[in-house]
């Protein structure tokens, strides 16, 4: 779980640099996508075991921080966002149909 203290540190890092002025929804979303692509690039042409844990942590950290900044921009509670999404996923992927099956929900 990401603590309130950690989220506050992320926001303080941003505020100390006066970067909030650049953090509009579009640019935060684009930055999140860029960082997610950098995460994907770690796996490009490699097996799972060939990926550096340190690089994985670095890129995953970037993705998570931009997600937190975007949620904060829209005053979203991340715990609520995740709980709501889990509820939706439980409805889309009932255990009896989805267990051991990677098929998308609309094809189950």
Whereabouts are the PLM-identified features?
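Flexible "arm" and connector segments at domain edges
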Residues: 1-60, 64-108
